[in-house]
Amino acid sequence: MLTLSQFEIIRPTYESSQEETLNWLIQAHTQSEAYSQGKKAEQIKPFTLSLRQKLDHVACKPNRISKRGHILSDFLHTEWEKMKVYRLEESSFGVDLTTRSKIFSDQVEDAFEQFYPKSAASPDHLIHVTCTGYVSPSGGQKMVSQRGWGEKTLVSHVYHMGCSASIPALRLAQGSLQVEGCVDVVHTELCSLHTNPSLHGLNQLVSQSLFADGFIKYRAQASCSSEHFQLYTLHEELVSNSFDSMHWKIENWGFALSLSQEIPALIAQSIYPYLVRMSQKSGFTIEYILQNALFAIHPGGPKIVQSIQAVLGLSFAQVAHSKFILQQFGNMSSATLPHVWKEILEDPKVVTGSLIVSLAFGPGLTICGSIMEKRLPCG
């Protein structure tokens, strides 16, 4: 069976409180609109007031997300001419995708160097997961080549699958795992590269109030010598006729995210029958799971966790780790669920033998999940 262990986080260079980030967004959107109108920011105060009211209505509040990490210093000031990405005195959205991709590539290469110091042993298989930038050869491939690991280490990519990509990554790891081998999964999500201050719609304001940068690595193997998760089952479904609810498209300026307000309702109406089908594959009854399992839910936003908690009748304790990660880090796309896993694995209050149900959601609309058990060292 597949086990997961050795979770390691690298925090982004910078961090801002949610209140600071929301204030920055107001100023950025105002500057973008002023550029489009050929005016100065102070000349469009009615726009600024209207935008502030919209954000007050739809943005994720500081009591839900306390802070967010970002690799760009841009979010720490409003001197637009000194920005790396958001040069809003030159255009309404900042630099183009080519420039953002170069920043992504540099940051990912640096992350791999941090995850794998010179003394690190090579994994048998390295899976790179991201939906926020694609450069070939990837940072993982470059590192493997530079270290001379190319004859032993296979490199695979799980790209553009959105917030649910950790589950397909586990499926890939499970399929390639050898009895004696190990598979490393590395998530590098740089969501802060893809804010567009020229898009003032409500769904854009919602997403811009949620997403953050995140980096995490973990190991999959047949057995391990530390506390770990043992995987029982993986399950993935597409919700019928829901493909318009979530889009992640590549534009000339960056990656454009579109989220429908119907997503929480779509998930709420689909999650119980989905969970029944996944439980049947695992050997556990749905009744046992609902009463005893902890739920590692990808916190795409507070409403996602709340709606699932309500529909399934879960206690606060069963979803507490998901809410905590959202509050501490924001939505880091595919890196978020592994952060929840790490929090559960290292929580001494979660005893050995605890069942963990994971749920994540991506474009499609896709529901991905797993059932695991927290266990003591083995093998």
Regions found by a protein language model. Give the residues of each.
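Condensing-enzyme catalytic core mediating Claisen C-C bond formation in acyl metabolism
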Residues: 1-99, 196-269, 273-277, 361, ...
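Claisen-condensing/thiolase-fold acyl-transfer catalytic domains that form or cleave C-C bonds
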Residues: 131-132, 150-152, 157-178, 268, ...
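Active-site-adjacent elements of ketosynthase-type condensing enzymes
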Residues: 135-141, 185-206, 235-251, 302-310, ...
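Solvent-exposed alpha-helices and their adjacent loops that cap or buttress functional pockets
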Residues: 148-151, 176-179, 203, 208-212, ...
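Active-site glycine-rich loop that binds ribose-phosphate moieties when present
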Residues: 152-153, 158, 166-172, 190-214
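Membrane-interfacial loop- and helix-cap regions that link adjacent transmembrane helices
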Residues: 245-247, 251-252, 258, 276-294, ...
